[in-house]
């Protein structure tokens, strides 16, 4: 409670942590992080000017850190209700050095904006102090299972310390690093949100265990429905009743966030809005489609 009191000014203006202000204050996601170090079976990243889907992992383009200042000035001029600047992809924020370059620019040029990142948590224990030094205080970590035998059905592989881990081995490693990172970040006074993708045929009865496990470390949990696509295109999305039921069970342990828009990596404005600054990317990227890097070992892309 002391931590929440200390950072109450952040929570009062953060639409992704406080659903009471989701239609009052806006956020901007900076798509500076294209590379990812895990392969979720439901995730299909896309970076293209033709991409009009409204879901995580997609963006009109990849923004370079040197363009961030101009980009934010344009946004803040058009949308003065923007209070939060976040980095949420289209890959994993902590697996891209551009994330830290961008956060440094924001901290120097836009100190009044709340800085936020989303991550799979694999590298959180390695970088949480760097984030603290850049005055980041809100972190979202996606945790879809805390049992390896469940997570291996959701994640194909994990790339860590220049080595690829598949199946159960990769799932064990990811869970271990997520728990380590979340605990350390919580001790460092970060405000943490746990995102959990609800996959009825895989983790429906397990999500409450995630809530129980992280109840002393997370401020809020955001349970979001599976978008059937990629390797999970044959699976079904949860019904509204199923989502309500799981949230009610989890709410016994962690407060639930119910205003998530499952936003793009380049989302701008209020959560309910679908604003995209197409003209900016038109000017910065002349190619028809922008090549998406996966990571250094490109033959492991997905």
Curated annotation (Swiss-Prot):
It comes from the Archaea. One of its GO terms (molecular function) is metal ion binding. Its EC number is 4.-.-.-. Its cofactor is [4Fe-4S] cluster. Binds 3 [4Fe-4S] clusters per monomer. One cluster is coordinated with 3 cysteines and an exchangeable S-adenosyl-L-methionine. The two others probably act as substrate. Changing residue 36 to A: Loss of activity. Gene3D superfamilies: Aldolase class I. GO terms for biological process: nitrogen fixation. Keywords: 4Fe-4S, Iron, Iron-sulfur, Lyase, Metal-binding, Nitrogen fixation, S-adenosyl-L-methionine. [4Fe-4S] cluster 2 binds at residues 260, 263. It is an enzyme of class 4 (lyase). Residues 22-264 form the Radical SAM core domain. InterPro entries: Aldolase_TIM (IPR013785), Elp3/MiaA/NifB-like_rSAM (IPR006638), rSAM (IPR007197). [4Fe-4S] cluster 1 binds at residues 36, 40, 43. Pathway: Cofactor biosynthesis; Fe-Mo cofactor biosynthesis. Belongs to the radical SAM superfamily. NifB family. Monomer. This is FeMo cofactor biosynthesis protein NifB. It comes from Methanocaldococcus infernus (strain DSM 11812 / JCM 15783 / ME). The gene is nifB.
């Amino acid at each position: 409670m002391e931590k929440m009191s200390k950072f109450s000014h952040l929570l009062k203006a953060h639409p992704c942590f406080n659903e009471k202000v989701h239609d009052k204050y806006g956020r901007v996601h900076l798509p500076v992080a294209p590379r990812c170090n895990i392969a979720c079976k439901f995730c299909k990243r896309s970076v293209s000017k033709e991409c009009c889907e409204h879901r995580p992992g997609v963006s009109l383009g990849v923004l370079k850190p040197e363009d961030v200042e101009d980009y934010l000035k344009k946004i803040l001029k058009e949308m003065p209700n923007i209070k939060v600047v976040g980095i949420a992809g289209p890959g994993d924020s902590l697996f891209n050095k551009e994330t830290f370059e961008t956060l440094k620019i924001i901290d120097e040029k836009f100190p009044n904006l709340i800085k936020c990142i989303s991550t799979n948590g694999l590298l959180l224990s390695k970088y949480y102090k760097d984030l603290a030094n850049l005055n980041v205080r809100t972190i979202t970590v996606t945790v879809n299972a805390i049992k390896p035998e469940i997570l291996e059905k959701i994640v194909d592989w994990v790339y860590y310390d220049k080595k690829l881990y598949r199946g159960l081995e990769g799932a064990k490693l990811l869970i271990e690093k997520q728990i380590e990172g979340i605990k350390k970040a919580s001790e460092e006074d970060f405000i943490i949100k746990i995102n959990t993708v609800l996959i009825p045929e895989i983790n429906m009865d397990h999500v409450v265990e995630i809530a129980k496990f992280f109840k002393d470390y997370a401020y809020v949990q955001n349970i979001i429905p599976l978008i059937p696509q990629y390797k999970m295109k044959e699976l079904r999305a949860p019904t509204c009743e199923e989502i309500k039921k799981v949230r009610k069970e989890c709410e016994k342990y962690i407060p639930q966030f119910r205003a998530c828009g499952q936003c793009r990596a380049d989302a701008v404005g209020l959560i309910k809005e679908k604003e995209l600054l197409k003209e900016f990317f038109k000017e910065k990227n002349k190619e028809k489609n922008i090549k998406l890097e996966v990571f250094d070992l490109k033959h492991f892309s997905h």
